[in-house]
Structures are given as C-alpha cells and as structure tokens.
Amino acid sequence: MDRAEKREFVAWLNGAFKESGSVVVAHYTGLTVAQMSDLRSKMRDAGGSVKVAKNRLAKIALQGTESEGIADLFTGQTVVAYANDPITAPKVAVEFAKANDKLVILGGAMGATTLNADGVKSLASLPSLDELRAKLVGMIQTPAQRLAVLTSAPASQIARVIGAHARKNEAA
C-alpha cells in the first residue's frame, strides 16, 4: 500500500467509524480463511461489516470520532466489526465467538461509550431495534384486540340468552 492508498483507506475507515452505531474489536489469530469468510457473510447478512486493518491505520482513522477511546485495543491481529444498528455487530461477533474460540472479543464502542469484552457481550444480549419495534406493535395491538372481544361479548351473550329463551318457549 502506498501513501495515497493509505490516506484513502484511513479516510474511508474514519467515515465508517463515524457512521456506525457500534464497533467491536477482536483478535482473530488462528481463524482460517473459510471461518473469516463465514464471519464476513454473517455480518453482511445482518447489515454490518468486518474489516481487517493495520493497527496503526485504524488508530489514525479513530481520531476525531466518538469511538476514539478504543484505540488501545488495536494490538496484535485485530479485526473490526461495525454496523449502523448498535446491536448488530456485537450480536453477530459474540455468536460467532461462541462457535469459534479463536475469535476473542477485546471490546468495542457504542457511540462515545467505550465497552470492555463483557460490555460487548451484554450489548449482544439485548434485542435489536427491529425486535423492539415488533414487541411495541404487539403491545399496542393487544389492548385493541381485547377491547374488540369485550365489546362484542355482551352482544353475543344477549343473543344466546334470547335464543335460549326462544327455544324454551317453543318447547313449552
């Protein structure tokens, strides 16, 4: 990589750090190419990205971003996972790390908040924004459904009473 390519890469990575909702940093020593491709495809399917970057370039790219506090995590063979949704990158990275012990979560950032490995794992256990929206819609719809059942119940009960009374009169 010559200087121009490095500048372009740092500018691109800086933009990715600024736009992302969360960033996860992990060691990937010992992962095979197939495992790394699997991680990338899972992250891409979830709406995130995985990037292997030189530590020095990643530290430069972090300057001027909210995630600047994670610069100390860039030692050794590191991989960066990031996504616009704050839950996506931690969730996919932690799930992948459970299946592949060679991916070791070092920490990350969510906005200006720096997270250690346990913080990333806690963040991964939270529901995503789409899941929360679905739960909220379900909670909003439930009272309306109950109200519809309650308002229709008295009318149907009255109809049953009248029908039973009519059958009783016919039998007599």
Curated annotation (Swiss-Prot):
Keywords: Ribonucleoprotein, Ribosomal protein, RNA-binding, rRNA-binding. CDD domains: Ribosomal_L10 (cd05797). GO terms for cellular component: large ribosomal subunit. GO terms for biological process: translation. Pfam families: Ribosomal_L10. InterPro entries: Ribosomal_uL10, Ribosomal_uL10-like_sf, Ribosomal_uL10_bac, Ribosomal_uL10_bac_type, Ribosomal_uL10_CS_bac. GO terms for molecular function: large ribosomal subunit rRNA binding; structural constituent of ribosome. Part of the ribosomal stalk of the 50S ribosomal subunit. The N-terminus interacts with L11 and the large rRNA to form the base of the stalk. The C-terminus forms an elongated spine to which L12 dimers bind in a sequential fashion forming a multimeric L10(L12)X complex. NCBIfam families: PRK00099.1-1 (NF000955). Forms part of the ribosomal stalk, playing a central role in the interaction of the ribosome with GTP-bound translation factors. Belongs to the universal ribosomal protein uL10 family. This is Large ribosomal subunit protein uL10. The gene is rplJ.
